[in-house]
């Protein structure tokens, strides 16, 4: 196996370009310290008019929906769900696709963590440090590689300044929730002088085990277990009453969470260019609900509607409960960015990004003994330049990444693997009268080098063509045809052993081929006066779709799952509407509604349903704004999911009623926002069908949160 230094040598070759940019910075006059900010988005071209659906959360809208995980924060975006694993973990699922098919990024560089490796691994991108969050729905492989075949979530942090602020500014917020006694605090500071700018941010979160409306296990799971016990009694001729363990009730065992992190960033900014860096760290310790099948002693018939009595005594010392597995992680990340306007004739802007991450976590068993150690050292860089050629506004670039991954211990279900990726891409857009045309291509080479066994290499090609046609002044019709390819990830190729997060034995297949997807999507948009409306539909035809097939056998009472391939089809549609019903000086009344649905099936077989596909969702909401007062109420109906895969249990639907009230005031020149939020106000039992542990761990019960945010 090649050394890590040699693996990354090609990546660091791009860093030499930074030296040239830095030299140019030094040669430029410093008479103008504040330049027009280089706009950096998940897409290098203008987000306005893209054929691909894009959703952006920022400002007050983002503050209203912030949650402990990225997936939960994005819950209101049509087509986006969360693959939760307790309150600590919630990776986004876009249009039914998640895991290695959705790329989670921080400032256009991959998160570089191990959240793709297992559903119980936390994503290291923190929502509370975000300036904005962008979602590219649908294939985004042209820009970001095969890991984005289902879409992209990009969190913009502002940690590397692009301009020198005129004044020192900052913000601080603290919020506290009754459920799980959760406390979150975060703050940031931005300043600078001359040609230099700096950024500081930090956050802290602490939460106990959270309260749930009823049993931890679903009714379907309890019925299945009861049937199995009945069958066992019949087999042994034993008809005595079963006196087994009492089920967890009212509190989800081992769902506690503690996390902290922060970052320092600085930039040198010239007249036409800049160079900057950021250094960040992230530490967390959280319980893994569902890792063990231990139960509390009693669920208690005295459980009342508030299900909070005795909660303070239930959780102690954050994860020291006997029988509960705990994950303890630490990450250090370094980011570098440099940009220049008009560096050469015909090139409008040049941007270089590099991210390096050193990550490790230890999974402690219930006894407190260290179990499996997951570690990764990863680096990703991209050189991107925008230009005009043949009438096209375009962006071309190079992307190189290197990842050294290892898992050592009892739950090490995959061997150490080194992954190398190299990509070349081009995307462009042009107008022909009112008709807008988008096109792009990408070539990518991926090497997977395991510690033992055969190295695999993949050559991948992707292409896209999109059209945007205005239909009068109010309507716009857009369509996009994509062909994308994805290389199998290490877990799909080389898994071989028990994986307790998925409650299974996972067997990889080192002979897997690349996965291909032909996607056709269309979007109709209406915008006029007080009404905005969009309707999207899509169909994706997968060739050699990679999935885990249940073999029907068990080892040590765990089902054996085999990574395999088959053709599959996903289809769905989304609707989103906003109506500004009333307006007055200082505010107004706005109503909104939404709907999304996705269907995913293999093209052949007895049970063709792909597991963990989200059910239909309906959303209604209203926002009232009057001077300093804002109030928002929203209701979401999540349907039953009965179209289940092999050995998958159906999931009951639920309602989610939420309320957010905010009040703004000024203390001197400093704006302050007070807010009160209520989530799951009807205390419904909410189980996410996208979660591996949905039958063992429901979402939080009724939660009331209060907080304050101050800016200066």
Segment roles from a protein language model:
Residues 27-63, 71, 99:
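Short, acidic, small-residue-rich periplasmic hinge/interaction motif at the N-terminus
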Residues 70-73, 90-93, 102-105, 120-126, ...:
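N-terminal periplasmic accessory domains that precede
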Residues 110-139:
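Short acidic/polar hinge/loop motifs at secondary-structure boundaries
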Residues 180-206, 218-289, 328-347, 392, ...:
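Transmembrane beta-barrel wall of Gram-negative outer-membrane proteins
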Residues 213, 485, 541-543, 642, ...:
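C-terminal beta-signal and adjacent terminal beta-strands/loops
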Residues 253-255, 259, 273-350, 356-378, ...:
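Flexible loop and strand-edge segments within Gram-negative outer membrane beta-barrel domains
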Residues 376-385, 423-425, 512-513, 519, ...:
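Outer membrane beta-barrel strand-and-loop segments of large Gram-negative receptors
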Residues 392, 432-434, 534-542, 559-642, ...:
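Gram-negative outer-membrane beta-barrel transporters
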